[in-house]
């Protein structure tokens, strides 16, 4: 019998490349890339608990490690992370540990956000040049998302975080650590400088994200879904989840075909104007 030792470093490098190239950059108002050495503040619970995958059988994959964004951005990335913001989160997390759920299909879709106040965020904006806001979600087998806060919709805590950080920071980047699209109406409300779906990239996920943030790799991911303004805007919305039959109300106009043909104004992605593609300049 021949024994073969896998060169795990090569697999890790390929995974890192796939993560970086798969990032979907929806908006970039000359915020990214950010050169190493920049002063940055990290907001959001998910920065400390990167979702490497969804739940269910696909989530029960053993990995050797999963590093979180502060470790990678402040370590390999060379960014100067705001110590006061990190310390505030560390103290809060000590009293609000990660909630894992109690069994199969019981893992929460999200983790509650640390409350923020104007004085704290305003002071952080005076110390740091750029804010990274990390919003995380998980879902999976027997645990599909629903049209509720903390799932498809943002929670009140996430809305407050976005409102304050985008108000006081001249440069703000929202990183969506998710496995599926979210409601995106908040982009128009808070106008962050950059928005990116970083997805769930396994154990090398945060390293791949770093390669996009610092300009080593140009994000070339494409959305697998059309993002409507509201769930009710999808043509199949009124016929979803029937117990006795499947009724394909959209006929041949599935996905983008419906919006492109009949309702471009109901679309949040570049069929409309919420994410102007002229601002997606990226130099590596």
Describe each model-derived feature in a short phrase.
Residues 1-284:
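C-terminal non-catalytic regions of proteins with extracellular/luminal or membrane-system context
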């Amino acid at each position: 019998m021949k024994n073969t030792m896998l060169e795990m470093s090569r697999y890790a490098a390929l995974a890192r490349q796939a993560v970086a190239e798969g990032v979907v950059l929806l908006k970039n108002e000359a915020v990214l890339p950010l050169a190493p050495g920049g002063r940055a503040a990290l907001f959001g619970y998910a920065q400390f608990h990167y979702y490497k995958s969804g739940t269910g059988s696909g989530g029960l994959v053993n990995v050797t490690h999963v590093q979180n964004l502060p470790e990678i951005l402040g370590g390999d990335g060379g960014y100067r992370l705001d110590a006061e913001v990190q310390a505030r989160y560390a103290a809060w997390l000590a009293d609000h540990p990660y909630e894992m759920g109690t069994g199969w299909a019981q893992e929460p879709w999200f983790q509650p956000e640390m409350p923020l106040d104007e004085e704290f965020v305003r002071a952080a904006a005076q110390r740091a040049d750029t804010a990274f806001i990390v919003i995380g979600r998980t879902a999976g087998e027997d645990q599909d998302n629903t049209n509720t806060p903390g799932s498809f919709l943002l929670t009140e805590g996430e809305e407050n975080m976005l409102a304050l950080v985008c108000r006081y920071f001249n440069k703000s980047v929202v990183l969506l650590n998710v496995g599926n699209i979210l409601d995106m109406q908040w982009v128009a409300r808070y106008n962050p400088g950059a928005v990116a779906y970083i997805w769930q990239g396994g154990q090398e996920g945060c390293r791949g994200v770093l390669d996009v943030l610092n300009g080593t790799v140009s994000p070339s991911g494409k959305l697998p879904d059309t993002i409507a303004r509201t769930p009710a805007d999808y043509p199949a919305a009124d016929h979803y989840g029937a117990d006795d039959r499947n009724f394909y109300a959209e006929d041949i106009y599935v996905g983008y075909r419906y919006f492109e043909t009949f309702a471009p104004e109901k679309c949040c992605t570049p069929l409309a104007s919420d994410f102007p593609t002229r601002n997606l300049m990226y130099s590596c």
